[in-house]
């Protein structure tokens, strides 16, 4: 994970403000935990962190602001034209050292069942953001390679550049990483690397209710939880 953070901050394709989009196969895969943990980790390193959220949902940006103290903006291609989205993104992120964009639902899930319009994929394409795919790897091995292959090849130019494995032990991670990168190389996607993992740890469990209104005591607990997640990552 340390190498992933270093690469993100040295992305030559985005000289002024490096950033990436965190997406997943589906909801409840660990996107929010990963996004919040990484924001916390970068802040602890003294970086100026900026956040975005795909879609019109206001709850996650509110969570980014209230719990992490990170300015956050919605990136919505359903209500906004592409040019307006690009302009808003550049204005929002211009003073940041790193920008983390949190996806919505699954990577290709848009505003309707049969369209990618407004999806995380759509936003990544529009802004030219590299994508890190968060995958719940608990109870899986070789099948993970098949899942990645299917998602990467479902549409052209997916922009997926990294895989973040969720719910993986420190002991198993090196073996899963080696297997996945070998398989990805074999099927012609050697540019995609496994960039890190999140262990099975309570600090990465953010219940849905935590993303709404919380009491002052819950706020303190959440801030401490996210701080610990950042230290682990």
Task: Label the predicted regions.
Residues 142-233:
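Internal gly/pro-rich beta-alpha loop/helix module
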């Amino acid at each position: 994970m340390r190498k992933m953070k270093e690469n993100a901050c040295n992305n030559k394709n985005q000289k002024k403000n490096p950033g990436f989009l965190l997406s997943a196969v589906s909801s409840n895969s660990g996107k929010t935990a990963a996004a919040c943990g990484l924001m916390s980790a970068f802040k602890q390193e003294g970086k100026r962190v900026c956040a975005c959220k795909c879609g019109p949902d206001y709850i996650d940006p509110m969570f980014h602001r209230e719990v992490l103290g990170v300015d956050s903006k919605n990136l919505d291609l359903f209500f906004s034209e592409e040019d307006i989205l690009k302009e808003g993104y550049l204005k929002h992120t211009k003073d940041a050292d790193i920008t983390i964009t949190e996806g919505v639902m699954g990577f290709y899930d848009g505003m309707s069942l049969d369209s990618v319009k407004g999806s995380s994929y759509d936003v990544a394409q529009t802004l030219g953001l590299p994508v890190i795919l968060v995958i719940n790897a608990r109870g899986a091995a070789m099948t993970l390679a098949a899942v990645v292959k299917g998602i990467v090849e479902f549409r052209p130019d997916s922009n997926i550049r990294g895989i973040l494995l969720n719910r993986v032990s420190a002991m198993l991670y090196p073996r899963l990483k080696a297997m996945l990168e070998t398989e990805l190389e074999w099927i012609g996607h050697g540019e995609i690397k496994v960039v890190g993992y999140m262990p099975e740890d309570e600090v990465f469990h953010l219940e849905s209710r935590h993303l709404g209104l919380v009491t002052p005591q819950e706020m303190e607990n959440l801030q401490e939880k996210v701080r610990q997640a950042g230290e682990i990552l």
